Curated annotation (Swiss-Prot):
Localization of this protein: Membrane
Biased composition (Pro residues): 491-513
Keyword terms, alphabetized: ATP-binding, Kinase, Magnesium, Membrane, Metal-binding, Nucleotide-binding, Serine/threonine-protein kinase, Transferase, Transmembrane, Transmembrane helix
Topological relation to the membrane, as annotated: Single-pass membrane protein
Name recorded for this polypeptide: Probable serine/threonine-protein kinase DDB_G0286627
Active site: 148 (proton acceptor)
Organism domain of life: Eukaryota
Protein family per UniProt: Belongs to the protein kinase superfamily. STE Ser/Thr protein kinase family.
UniProt GO MF annotations: ATP binding; metal ion binding; protein serine kinase activity; protein serine/threonine kinase activity
Main location as per UniProt: membrane
Enzyme class: transferase
Organism: Dictyostelium discoideum
Enzymatic reactions: L-seryl-[protein] + ATP = O-phospho-L-seryl-[protein] + ADP + H(+); L-threonyl-[protein] + ATP = O-phospho-L-threonyl-[protein] + ADP + H(+)
Amino acid sequence: MTDKYNDWVKNKKHNNYNMAEDPLYYIKSNWVIERQLSKGSFGQVYKAHKKLDPNFVCAIKVIQYCKFTMKEVDYLKKLNDPKFVKYYSLEFNNSKTYAYIIMEFIEGESMKSIIENKKFSDIEIKEIIKELLKALVYLNDKGIMHRDLKPENIMFQNQNQNQNQNNKINLKLIDFGLSKAINENIINKTVKLQTISSVGTTLYMAPEILLNNKGSNSSLDIWSLGCIIVEMKWGLNQLCLQRPNNIPVFPVNSLFTEILNLCFQTEPSKRIKSHQLIKHPFFNDENEQFYNDNKEYFDFLKENERDSYIEIHNTESIGSNSTCSINEIRFENLYLIQSTYENQYPIKTITLHEKYTGISKLSHLNSKFKIIYLFLILLFLMTILVNLNRHVQTKFSIIQRDNIFLSITPESNPIKKPSPTQSSDYNQYSEGSQSSYESSSSSESSSESSSSESSSSESSSSSESQSSEINYSSNSNDLQPTDSSTTDPPVTDPPITDPPITDPPVTDPPITEPPVTETPKPTINPFFNTPVFICSQKIDQCLTVLNSQDLEFIDKKGRDQSMVLEYDGNAEQTFSIREKGGMYICLSGEHYHFSEKLKGRLNANKDGRDCTFNLITQFNIDKQANLYSFRSPNDQYIQSDETTRFISTKPGGLGSQSQFFIYFSHSLGPN
């Protein structure tokens, strides 16, 4: 470079040449220019070293001085992270027409040069995206958006230059000449879009910049990140198919389809944020292991996508649970597991809305295609009706916490009404609590239950009414339907008139008087598929439970035991909650009774926020399965197979101002 410069000076006429016009004239007095590194719309970057200290090598950016120069320097000063180029100093020439930004020299290659000579593997792409997201999160925390994120501005540092000799990808972001503070106008009036954007930069710009020259948040960098993913995965030719009004075109069945769907949202407000995207399970190795351990379930879902659905229990926030069919799953409502291995693609996730959107695009064709368009719309509507009429055959429950999947459980027919035998068993156990089903024929159900106990197992459910009549007419246990059928016409006809005599008991509408809507209804425990009893506001109407059990309610990591339920072991059989508010639960005899102090305040959150509890959480025990679980109204489950401990899947997961209940399984019964 020095020889070139000297030749250029020699070719000039010294009497007409003004040395001040040379941008390198000033910097050459203290620095030795080695070579040019890059050239852009605003200036050039050179590799140089000090004359007095040849070991001090740096990169010098030479640009015409303007207000953008000072902004770039201000942003560089704020960045103190290994993922960004280091800033050293700023110098000017005598007339202040040129500025010289002295920065760290990065020994390595740019992403652009690597893409031209090599194809990245899926694992490498995932690691690069993760590192870029970390850099974008750091920028957002500083209130800065890069605005010019592209392969030319991403440098990969050689391993021998990094002091930490590890196998991780070391990348650095450079060129903050177009950076802006978040919420600042993107395009300044004095600088036109055409002048600040080269052809390469325009390919990575978000639609709001290309169409409106507006944009004031970090979602601009997320769109550019998606463009970089497309180029790393499929090349620049695929990225060139991008149009401002549409999402870029790329192969549908790809490992990165869902990530790109999150990046390529044409509406900036709907585009995912960097701090949200980095928490995606795609970047979590533990979720990959979870996918491999439960691959049979996901394979089943692929084969039976119309007959299955997944219920997700996200323990991070209240009300985040969702249920959807497998062909409607998107990362907006359910995080699926992605694999980093080659030739393994995620479950197909095309929603009905996307199908309709694709069909609607046909409406822009010529009129001769209108008939085809209408036919496809009708076919689409028929598909919706068919899907709505399909009955769910299998459910998969997935427990998720901190973006890590904890368990996946298949359940058959999870929601079904209890059988008559179950209801009779339930009524037996509910006698001690003075509660029963809210049904107009409670006396008939009790007679049916008694008859079912004495009858053989071969009797069908359709003969229940006959068995009730036999029990009503005779007290003997010997039932002979064949003999009674011969004598039925003469003998049982008069008794048939007798039930009208029992019509006065039809004044049992007073029994309906118990609009005992106070008395709770049995429901289905989603964990065990068995009827359970929900306590109403009258807490003393709970079922009988096992006593003499040592129970402890702690969080998963054992942090401070913000809420502890334990058995005191004294003669009064008292269960208590130890907390600042002094709340407790008393076990008297065979029934739980709750203190009024439960309406106090309980500090259950890690950050110290107060939560108000009216009652306690739902409490389930399945004696036969030896399983114990808590459940809150927001479907946050706490389950353990130990008899002495309950493990919480979410410390402090109980929400503020929430109503809690207590559950007991019907399989428990009195001792």
